[in-house]
Swiss-Prot record:
One of its GO terms (biological process) is muscle atrophy. LRR repeats lie at residues 154-175, 180-201, 206-227, 231-253, 254-275, 279-300, 309-330. This is Tubulin-specific chaperone E. The lineage of its organism: Eukaryota, Metazoa, Chordata, Craniata, Vertebrata. GO terms for cellular component: cytoplasm; cytoskeleton. Gene3D superfamilies: CAP Gly-rich-like domain, Phosphatidylinositol 3-kinase Catalytic Subunit, Chain A, domain 1, Ribonuclease Inhibitor. The modification N-acetylserine is found at S2. Tubulin-folding protein; involved in the second step of the tubulin folding pathway and in the regulation of tubulin heterodimer dissociation. Required for correct organization of microtubule cytoskeleton and mitotic splindle, and maintenance of the neuronal microtubule network. Belongs to the TBCE family. The modification N6-acetyllysine is found at K460. One of its GO terms (molecular function) is unfolded protein binding. The keyword Transferase does not apply. The modification Phosphoserine is found at S492.
């Protein structure tokens, strides 16, 4: 806190009693004597008015209770970069130590060191820093030119989130002294960005990661600044109310990751404007209200030219409720991983299995690896579940008669491919099971490992409608043996010594007349 005001006080970011604000006015507010600062709070509930007092408008606020008048002595205008860095990282003299003793401060931790020369130790400590965090340290400006470069020339990673930086120009003054800067986090600094492209310099020539969450930046401002980021690979723009208004032409061409989450103004049509980024592998679109997506350049069963390198897509917390969304994702030529949690579609029965069946090349779903046997099971279940619908739409096991209508092919683009892969569903598979009491469905079965007689015989209750494939999945988890290696048969309690193979993975236990008290025989 200081009674001396900065020359450029209007627009400065400040902190007052732990709350953040922007200075909008400096001057007298009659009839009360003295100098006042009019501030607009980040939290509008903190304020008292809209910038007016007794009928006179001194400044404007976006919210009717977003403004207050405060005395300059109550306002924290922050520290320069190096002062904040020393407060957090460097040696401080201990009040009771002798002249050869000092205490090392890292965050809030104090570590005593004996016998080191203070100044030399301080300088060497700063020069050794490469990865620093000045989160919430009230950094407001660069300070005297050249001092950062002299004191800490080896810094590569800087977290400056939640500070008092007011303008992009001030960020440039800091960054131009860090010649090896690779990653910079400026989140939660309400920054004023240049309205047109700044003069090209080498300030950010090594920058690969830039985090601008909650900075108030617009897409136009991103594109204005982007020529200064020639090797940028990761850009985070969460919670800025961004709308994508134009294509990034000759900029951001090396970007691999783009986070646009929590920007509700973004819609499906805007995504086409970034679809030509040649190296974009990772796209985060969580919490933007997304409900649909289309790649109009690709027909059913074909691949789109849009997002050619996209491998990882995150669309959590959206309004996705139609399977057509998932169908479209199968058109992406490079997609390997999808996260689609907390969407209306996620609540559908067997939603994850259906997603796996619909997207052929998917390797990871909701951060879980898709094993080959899991994919096979999902595709077989999908083929069976929609078999009757396929038949009604004109599908047929005979290739010469197999002509499902356009509506079915649109809703199930991969169904024909699955029939080619596994064969068309047989009549027996498509018969509807008649419902009956659950108690009658449950079978108490012994499970014996035939080639490992020393293993304890297990006992499990299984529904007789459970398919052989799902029984194998259960046994795979119990025995820690891959599904593909398991062979199943059973021995009837009514016919001791006779072994019956369970050779069709798609058939339920009841198909083989497995009964209560029978013994499943497992080999691998």
């Amino acid at each position: 806190m200081s009674d001396i005001l900065p020359l450029d006080v209007i627009g400065r970011r400040v902190e007052v009693n732990g709350e953040y604000a922007t200075v909008r006015f400096c001057g007298a507010v009659p009839p009360v004597a003295g100098l006042w600062l009019g501030v607009e709070w980040d939290n509008p509930e903190r304020g008292k008015h809209d910038g007016s007092h007794e009928g006179t408008m001194y400044f404007k606020c976006r919210h009717p209770t977003g403004g207050s008048f405060v005395r300059p002595s109550k306002v924290n205008f922050g520290d320069d970069f190096l002062t904040a860095l020393k407060k957090r990282y460097v040696l401080e003299d201990g009040p009771d130590d002798d002249e050869n003793s000092c205490s090392l401060k890292v965050g809030s931790k104090q570590v005593q060191t004996i016998g080191f020369e203070h100044i030399t130790k301080k300088q060497s400590q700063l020069r050794a820093l490469q990865d620093i965090s000045l989160w919430n340290c009230a950094v407001s400006h660069a300070g005297e030119q050249g001092r950062i470069a002299e004191a800490c020339p080896n810094i590569r990673v800087v977290n400056l989130s939640k500070n008092l930086l007011s303008t992009w120009d001030e960020v440039v003054l800091i960054a131009e002294q860090l010649k090896d800067l690779e990653a910079l986090d400026l989140s939660e600094n309400k920054l004023q960005f240049p309205s047109d492209s700044p003069t090209l310099t080498r300030t950010f020539s090594t920058l690969k990661t830039l985090v601008l969450n909650k900075t108030g930046i617009t897409w136009t401002e991103v594109l204005h600044c982007a020529p200064s980021w020639p090797v940028l690979e990761e850009l985070y723009l969460k919670s800025n109310n961004i709308s994508i208004s134009e294509r990034p032409v000759n900029v951001l061409q090396k970007m691999r990751l783009l986070d646009l989450s929590s920007n509700p103004s973004i819609d499906e049509s805007q995504l086409s404007l970034i679809a030509d980024l040649p190296r974009l592998e990772h796209l985060v679109l969580s919490d933007i209200g997304l409900s649909s997506i289309h790649f109009p350049d690709a027909e059913i069963g074909c691949k789109t030219s849009m997002f050619p390198a996209l491998k990882y897509l995150i669309v959590n917390d959206n309004q996705i409720s139609e399977w057509s969304f998932i169908n479209e994702l199968d058109k992406l030529q490079s997609l390997q991983a999808l996260s689609c949690t907390r969407n209306p579609l996620s609540k559908a029965d067997k939603a994850e299995e259906i997603i796996i069946a619909k997207i052929a090349q998917l390797r990871t779903l909701n951060r879980c690896q898709i094993l080959p046997e899991e994919r096979r099971g999902a595709e077989l279940d999908y083929r069976k579940a929609f078999g009757n619908e396929w038949r009604k739409a004109g599908g047929h096991p005979d290739p010469d008669k197999n002509r499902p209508n356009a509506a079915f092919l649109s809703a199930h683009p991969r169904y024909q491919l699955l029939c080619c892969k596994y064969g068309a569903p047989e009549d027996e598979e498509l018969k509807t099971q008649q419902p009956f009491m659950l108690k009658k469905q449950l079978l108490t079965l012994k499970i014996k490992c035939s080639n490992q007689p020393e293993r304890q015989i297990l006992e499990k209750q299984l529904p007789d409608s459970m398919t052989v494939q799902k029984v194998k999945g259960l046994l795979s988890r119990l025995l820690k043996v891959p599904v593909s290696e398991l062979l199943l048969s059973y021995e009837s309690s009514k016919m001791p010594g006779r072994e019956i193979e369970l050779e069709n993975d798609l058939q339920p236990l009841q198909f083989y007349s497995v009964e209560n008290g029978d013994c499943l025989l497992v080999r691998w």
